[in-house]
Amino acid sequence: MQTLLIIRGHSGSGKSTFALQKMAEFKQNFTEGVLFHVENDHFLRENGEYHWTVERFQQAKQLAQQQLADALNYCVENPQHDVCIVLSNVGGNAKEIEKVVARATSYGLHTEVYRLQNFFPNTHGVDAQVVYEMYLHLCDQPVQNEILLPPIQPMTKAICREIKKLQAQKRKNRYTKKM
């Protein structure tokens, strides 16, 4: 069996933890299986420290895209091998995700797209306002057939109020732009 699992969510949604769980399940079921874990954040660490800049992010994204292409090529070249590719990123661009799904499907891979909605403290120090914007952006960019996982750590009432304020501001900005 060859599978592509795409895990998307805002910072602090639990993507890395969920990815580790899915990889452990795969290894338990396919002890000889080949596992690829593709994540931009892997390329943003230096000596165990997370360093984010626009330039580093662009480079990390390119490296992750190459790693994904290599993993997909491995599947094509080794159709007899059990393979699981786990792609865990924010995944804010629905069209980009759908292209990856279409490519993997054309290679015969089973695909699943998960979106996490937890609100854990994020480990990268991302500003709360940015996290809320990421969350709203993902809500506005659904991917066809994605699986919305119920939150283990749902948003608090305070976070809900902040997100509603942000939504109202965005609606107001859209309205004023049209005038």
Swiss-Prot record:
SUPFAM superfamilies on file: P-loop containing nucleoside triphosphate hydrolases
Domain of life where this protein originates: Bacteria
Listed InterPro entries: P-loop_NTPase
UniProt-recorded name of the protein: Uncharacterized protein PM0531
Lineage: Bacteria, Pseudomonadati, Pseudomonadota, Gammaproteobacteria, Pasteurellales
Gene3D superfamilies per record: P-loop containing nucleotide triphosphate hydrolases
